[in-house]
């Protein structure tokens, strides 16, 4: 596909005025509706990326557009220095829908992960009575939870970690999917485990069938919080409201983001019990935009639409169809198809084609899809 001068103009502007911390596909997008996206030359594409699960409702969902317009014209931001008539209804909706007692609203997924880490540490010191500054959190190799300074400290991705030190201590990394590794890492100083139920950027990697239930039992036995990061896997993406439901367990804390903002703005949250979140007193944590009226209104409506429009069940049905169709191709370039619902990953045999080259080939055929790795 030839890149037009019109598209080159926008690409050059990004290259000249911004750092090279992403490697985008060579297409300049300007419009979207539902599952379709158009570039600046009005070429039409099927969006197979969904902004890494942030646009699960489809682009410019009319119900969310209405909420966005109405709320932005009424009250968009106040800071948490005041009560609003949107935050309470949103918090009530999300806690009732998820079964957690409390929700601490933030913006980006990484912010919510940081919130979970701080909450777990404070609980460890004030409730579990771990010695000051000794709390540890067990994480998994191959994880991706964001790129803030603390989070990259326990990343396995060298490109996210190298030359950004000194790194934050207090994290113990274990093999993803290994029950024994988790058991061996537990000490009296263990505050929590922090895992993705399915590793997204790692390549849609699912753990062994009973691993999450094993981790749940280990945490119960040792008075350790089980915290799951479902920023990408949550809110219907895997054919259930949450990916952990496939394992028939419940975590002590849950991190959500991406689709929570309906594809309009960053909205995230850390959900847990009163026992954990009671220790977050005034001044301990916060964000100017966290829980803002506009984000709260959109998040509340985005949650309601999951059930009103049957999006979770549709993800299950269409995901099964899509996965089976991919498997029936019996293609020599496909090594494995992984995932559940509409969160699928196709591992490509590099002997035949690289992930980046496949993305370019799909682009020529008007399909937008790319590798989870920012370097591929």
Task: State where each predicted segment sits.
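A structural motif shared across PLP-dependent enzymes of the aminotransferase-like
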Residues: 28-36, 53-69, 80-92
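Amphipathic alpha-helix from the class-I
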Residues: 70-74, 275, 294-313, 327-330
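Conserved PLP-binding catalytic core of the aspartate aminotransferase-like
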Residues: 319-323, 332-361
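Conserved small/polar residues in nucleotide/adenosyl-binding loops
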Residues: 369-376
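Catalytic PLP-binding core of fold-type I/II PLP enzymes
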Residues: 205-239
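PLP-dependent aspartate aminotransferase-fold enzymes
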Residues: 92-192
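Active-site PLP attachment segment
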Residues: 149, 240, 245-279, 291-298
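Active-site-adjacent loop/helix segments that line or gate small-molecule/cofactor pockets in enzymes
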Residues: 1-33, 81
């Amino acid at each position: 596909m030839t890149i037009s001068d019109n598209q080159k103009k926008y690409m050059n502007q990004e290259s000249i005025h911004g750092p090279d911390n992403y490697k985008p596909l060579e297409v300049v997008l300007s419009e979207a509706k539902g599952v379709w996206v158009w570039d600046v030359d009005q070429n039409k594409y099927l969006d197979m990326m969904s902004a890494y699960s942030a646009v699960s409702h489809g682009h410019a969902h009319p119900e969310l557009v209405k909420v966005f317009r109405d709320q932005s014209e009424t009250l968009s931001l106040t800071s948490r220095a005041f009560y609003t008539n949107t935050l309470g209804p949103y918090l009530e909706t999300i806690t009732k829908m998820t079964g957690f007692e409390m929700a601490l609203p933030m913006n980006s997924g990484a912010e919510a992960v940081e919130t979970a880490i701080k909450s777990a540490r404070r609980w460890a010191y004030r409730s579990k009575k771990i010695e000051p500054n000794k709390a540890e959190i067990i994480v998994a190799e191959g994880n991706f939870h964001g790129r803030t300074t603390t989070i990259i400290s326990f990343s396995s991705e060298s490109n996210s970690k190298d030359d950004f030190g000194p790194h934050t201590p207090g994290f113990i990394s274990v093999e993803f999917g290994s029950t024994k590794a988790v058991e061996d890492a537990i000490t009296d100083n263990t505050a929590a485990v922090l895992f993705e139920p399915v590793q997204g950027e790692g390549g849609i990697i699912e753990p062994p069938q009973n691993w999450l239930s094993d981790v749940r039992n280990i945490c119960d036995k040792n008075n350790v919080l089980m915290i799951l990061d479902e920023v990408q896997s949550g809110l219907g993406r895997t054919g259930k409201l949450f990916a952990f439901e496939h394992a028939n367990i419940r975590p002590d804390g849950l991190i959500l983001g991406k689709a929570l903002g309906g594809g309009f703005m960053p909205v995230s949250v850390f959900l847990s019990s009163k026992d954990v979140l009671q220790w977050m007193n005034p001044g301990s944590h916060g964000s100017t935009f966290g829980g803002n009226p506009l984000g709260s209104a959109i998040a509340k409506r985005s949650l309601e639409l999951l059930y009103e429009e049957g999006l979770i069940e549709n993800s299950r049905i269409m995901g099964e169809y899509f996965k089976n169709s991919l498997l029936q191709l019996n293609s020599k370039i496909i090594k494995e198809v992984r995932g559940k619902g509409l969160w699928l990953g196709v591992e490509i045999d590099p002997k035949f084609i690289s992930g980046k080259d496949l993305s370019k080939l799909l682009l020529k055929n008007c399909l937008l899809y790319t590798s989870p790795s920012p370097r591929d």
